């Protein structure tokens, strides 16, 4: 399933931790808020993905 603003849980925490390992400074609380969405957009732009701020299959595969 797609992770987006409003999502919560372990998968969101995993994304936050991965983004932090790449230089972001997110609170890894498992809550997908505006800061996480903005960090995901930066990741997507850096990796040639559609920068929609949501973590779907393509973003997940590139991230992990």
Describe every region a protein language model picked out.
Residues 1-2, 62-64:
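Intrinsically disordered, low-complexity Ser/Thr-rich linker and spacer segments
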Residues 1-30:
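Acidic, Ser/Thr/Pro/Gly-enriched interdomain connector segments
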Residues 51-53, 62:
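Terminal recognition/anchoring or ligand-binding modules at protein termini
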Residues 20-23, 46-50:
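Short capping motifs at secondary-structure boundaries
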Residues 40-43:
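Conserved hydrophobic/aromatic packing and binding residues within compact polymer-binding modules
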